[in-house]
Amino acid sequence: MNYILIGVILGIVQGISEWIPISSKTQVLIVSSTLLGLSFNVAYSFGLFMEIGTIAAAIFYFRSEISGLLKALVRMSSRREDYLLLKFLVIVTIITGLVGVPLYLFVISLPILGLPMTVLGVVLLIDGIVIYLSRKNYFPRKGLHDLKLRDIIIVGIAQGLAALPGVSRSGMTTSALILLGVKPEEAFKLSFISLIPAALGAISVTVLFSKHEVSQAVHSVSLSGLLISIVVATFVSIFFINALLRFARTNKVVLLVIILGIMAIISGILSDIAKGFY
């Protein structure tokens, strides 16, 4: 198959699946194994490397928030929200690293698939039913300023678990925030911004510990194919970030939580199916 076409397909898969509760790693694993015949380790490393496109999309879409973060970092911001977001990202990223790096090193030798996402999906479905039954008394209303240290640590752990194949990073973090009572739009926004340092760290770890696999992956699809996949993933990601945030603003919490739950269960099932590819 033409490497340019492969790059476009992989870019679309990455750009869509990164932002919804279906593991982008698993989908890229399936596509790369089917189209390129890559082994598990090579395909997994390639999937993480492709997140360059989604990082670029997040930085572009949230450029105002990123600017505020940089100002807060050098103590030049006058906005309390910038410092709260900086604190949130620092803690979440540290916890993500402490949980995610050991899991990644473990995954290289022993792939674990869909169970975590399936369990999360069931929990979300139950939560959706609870919210519906108690909707007069309960509604996710928390914002960033309401999050306690314990809440932020939980989000970091949830994001770290996404190092496992079959576990969606956005699904874990968004779901954790909503289950903690954060309003949907804020939950999606915090989840998407959290991607930036987490994905940069994942790419660094991949290059550091899996140089051979990354080299094989790039060789399999060609450098031009890889670059095309990154560009396509960037543009597709921008579209999906905007669409998901617009949907979150509708405040259809019950529908949103149930959709997240169903997609998480589907992700778990797809991950188990993907086992046959490697």
Curated annotation (Swiss-Prot):
GO biological process, one term: peptidoglycan metabolic process
Keywords of the record: Cell membrane, Hydrolase, Membrane, Transmembrane, Transmembrane helix
Disulfide bonds: none
A GO molecular function held by the record: undecaprenyl-diphosphatase activity
Primary site of residence: membrane
EC number: 3.6.1.27
Transmembrane parts of this sequence: 3-23, 42-62, 88-108, 112-132, 152-172, 190-210, 225-245, 253-273
Membrane-protein topology: Multi-pass membrane protein
InterPro entries per record: UppP (IPR003824)
Pfam families registered for this protein in UniProt: BacA
Enzyme class: hydrolase
GO cellular component labels: plasma membrane
Reactions listed under catalytic activity: di-trans,octa-cis-undecaprenyl diphosphate + H2O = di-trans,octa-cis-undecaprenyl phosphate + phosphate + H(+)
Subcellular location: Cell membrane
Family from the record: Belongs to the UppP family.
Function according to Swiss-Prot or TrEMBL: Catalyzes the dephosphorylation of undecaprenyl diphosphate (UPP).
Designated name of the protein: Undecaprenyl-diphosphatase
Gene: uppP
